[in-house]
């Protein structure tokens, strides 16, 4: 595994952004989360991605959260910055602002809502890559964006030097094989789907950017450490215990359930989210609590 591949591999946390009851970012809590994941053995953190509520933070807030996450990490764990937008110019602005932030790379989502063609998607990511030397990880999540970046488009983008990988969040593990075939073995493929993450590793993915990791960090780190050395019996044992949790953390829109679960476990002080997201419905809370118990977290 190359140095770059090892930097973006294993158990990567799609980190929540803790907030107080007024909707302000709770930086003291964020610092504790960073320490928690370092101690648990997580391999990297994604700051202000989908799970970090990037859509409801201003550009200035996004940058500050990322910079503080890097500061708290003190070089002990790679930080990947969420830097996507559905306007190419805005994504470029965000990426440029991160130039000297100390991040290991940027995660940039397929433009959402405006539904570009495959050529539009290609030109979008090409323009972002050309504005920076930072490694770029593409992010395909059609269930949220309304656009699906095809493996053939990924392969074209893989020819650009600083586009180094993709977070593939369709949940279709056959995509892992297809992208590896078309983009080459050195192109990093990260699963973005907890329920199929272990299967993705078996098919050649280098790691998983995980929501479950927020609340089961040590289990997830252990599971993917076992998986990446081929000890799938031990990995499957952990995964079976977490499978209910993988599913129930999406029982309402992410990051609603995971923030409530993190609050329930005492990892954050509040389950507050910014509107239009609201805290986990009371009638759903017992179901997520049961999943936490099955996982051995309560």
Curated annotation (Swiss-Prot):
Catalytic residues in the record: 139 (proton donor/acceptor), 167 (schiff-base intermediate with substrate)
Pathway(s) where this gene product acts: Amino-acid biosynthesis; L-lysine biosynthesis via DAP pathway; (S)-tetrahydrodipicolinate from L-aspartate: step 3/4
Binding site for pyruvate: 51, 209
Reactions this protein catalyses: L-aspartate 4-semialdehyde + pyruvate = (2S,4S)-4-hydroxy-2,3,4,5-tetrahydrodipicolinate + H2O + H(+)
Subunit and interaction comment: Homotetramer; dimer of dimers.
Subcellular location: Cytoplasm
EC number: 4.3.3.7
GO cellular component, one term: cytosol
CDD domains linked: DHDPS
Gene Ontology MF annotations: 4-hydroxy-tetrahydrodipicolinate synthase activity
Organism, as annotated: Haemophilus influenzae (strain PittGG)
Record carries keyword Transit peptide: no
Protein's job: Catalyzes the condensation of (S)-aspartate-beta-semialdehyde [(S)-ASA] and pyruvate to 4-hydroxy-tetrahydrodipicolinate (HTPA).
NCBIfam families in the record: dapA
Similarity-based family: Belongs to the DapA family.
Family matches, as SMART domains: DHDPS
Keywords, ordered alphabetically: Amino-acid biosynthesis, Cytoplasm, Diaminopimelate biosynthesis, Lyase, Lysine biosynthesis, Schiff base
Principal subcellular localisation of the protein: cytoplasm
Marked site (Part of a proton relay during catalysis) residue numbers: 50, 113
Signal peptide annotation: none
Official protein name in the record: 4-hydroxy-tetrahydrodipicolinate synthase
């Amino acid at each position: 595994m190359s140095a770059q591949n090892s930097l973006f591999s294993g158990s990567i946390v799609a980190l929540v952004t803790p907030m107080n009851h007024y909707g302000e970012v709770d930086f003291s809590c964020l610092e504790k989360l960073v320490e928690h994941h370092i101690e648990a053995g997580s391999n990297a953190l994604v700051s202000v991605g989908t799970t970090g509520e990037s859509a409801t933070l201003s550009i200035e807030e996004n940058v500050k959260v990322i910079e503080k996450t890097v500061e708290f990490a003190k070089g002990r764990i790679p930080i990947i910055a969420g830097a996507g937008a559905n306007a190419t110019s805005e994504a470029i602005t965000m990426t440029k602002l991160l130039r000297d932030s100390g991040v290991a790379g940027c995660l940039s989502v397929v433009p959402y809502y405006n539904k570009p063609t495959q050529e539009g998607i290609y030109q979008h990511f090409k323009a972002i890559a050309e504005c920076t030397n930072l490694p770029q990880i593409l992010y395909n999540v059609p269930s949220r964006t309304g656009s699906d970046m095809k493996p053939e488009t990924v392969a074209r983008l893989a020819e650009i030097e600083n586009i180094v990988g993709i977070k593939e969040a369709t949940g279709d593990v056959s995509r892992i094989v297809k992208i590896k075939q078309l983009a080459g073995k050195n192109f990093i493929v990260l699963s973005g789907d907890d329920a199929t993450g272990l299967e993705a590793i078996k098919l050649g993915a280098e790691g998983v950017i995980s929501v479950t990791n927020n609340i089961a960090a040590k289990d997830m780190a252990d599971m993917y450490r076992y998986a990446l050395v081929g000890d799938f019996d031990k990995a499957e044992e952990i995964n079976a215990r977490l499978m209910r949790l993988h599913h129930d953390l999406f029982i309402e829109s992410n990051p609603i359930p995971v923030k409530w679960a993190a609050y329930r476990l005492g990892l954050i002080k509040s389950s507050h989210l910014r509107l239009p997201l609201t805290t986990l419905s009371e009638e759903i809370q017992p179901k997520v609590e049961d999943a936490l118990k099955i996982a051995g977290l309560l």
